């Protein structure tokens, strides 16, 4: 039962981690959050801010009030990490791209603790074993894939959560740079706009993650979040928006050659985001067939989940 599955979230105050924590609490799981003893690097470059107004301190107070058990520790304190892990059944890591390789320390602690029934390494993007991405995102995907291989080699029970495109990255501005909401006059579309992409809200990522964590069917499998109403081409997304505002946008289609050139001359975060857009909107890295022996579709597993559709998500910007 969900109430018996104790869940530890690593990276609990991040853009995705906080949603995993709230989903765990909502599902009735005893929920633990590992809080660093020392502050993180406030000067590290940020890709996208969490879509929540709370400061870290406010969020932690909200967690405590909701019954989350806060544990102190970090990746460089092996004893504290093992102690935290021994208290739970499932470990969910939501680290950002700069900390992917630090997960080898988590795996080492999980092996020593000897009690973990499931580990979710920090994935929360496309399937890193199925992609055609370019730099600067390719090295991050390669690091995530290398962590998969360590997990498998060490015999750690796992679930890989492949959620593809967060609405906060791709949908809130129709993938337009330096915009915080969808355009009302002109829109830039990468490629021909006819490649399917998969969109999901960060809150729904939390929901599906916890459903998978409580589900024996997802053991040692990759769970893919490609929701029927959110599996859309760029042209379909733009059309949804045009219908809402009652206006046809002026469209500029950018060739792959131009996109690759722009990636090479841009700096962070533009080059990184543009490479993500290229991966989904041009290369079609959300378009593939799954292998039922090692994969599962989240929608097929949990058709009862009322997820936010792309159409509903865009309503807030009208």
Curated annotation (Swiss-Prot):
Q: What is this protein called?
A: Isoflavone reductase
Matching Pfam families: NmrA (PF05368)
Residue numbers annotated as active site:
144
Q: Catalyses which reaction? A: (3R)-vestitone + NADP(+) = 2'-hydroxyformononetin + NADPH + 2 H(+)
Q: Where does NADP(+) bind?
A: 11-17, 36, 44, 148
Question: What is this protein's gene name?
Answer: IFR
Q: Main role?
A: Reduces achiral isoflavones to chiral isoflavanones during the biosynthesis of chiral pterocarpan phytoalexins.
Ordered alphabetically, the record's keywords are: NADP, Oxidoreductase
Q: Does the keyword NADP apply?
A: yes
Q: Which organism is it from?
A: Cicer arietinum (Chickpea)
Q: Which InterPro entries does this UniProt record tie to the protein?
A: NAD(P)-bd_dom_sf (IPR036291), NmrA-like (IPR008030), NmrA-type/Isoflavone_red_sf (IPR050608), PCBER-like (IPR045312)
Q: Where on the tree of life does the source sit, at the highest rank? A: Eukaryota
EC number(s) on file? 1.3.1.45
MF-aspect GO terms = 2'-hydroxyisoflavone reductase activity
Family in the record: Belongs to the NmrA-type oxidoreductase family. Isoflavone reductase subfamily.
Which pathway does the UniProt entry assign to this protein?
Phytoalexin biosynthesis; pterocarpan phytoalexin biosynthesis
Question: Which GO terms of type biological process are on file?
Answer: lignan biosynthetic process
Q: Does the keyword Oxidoreductase apply?
A: yes
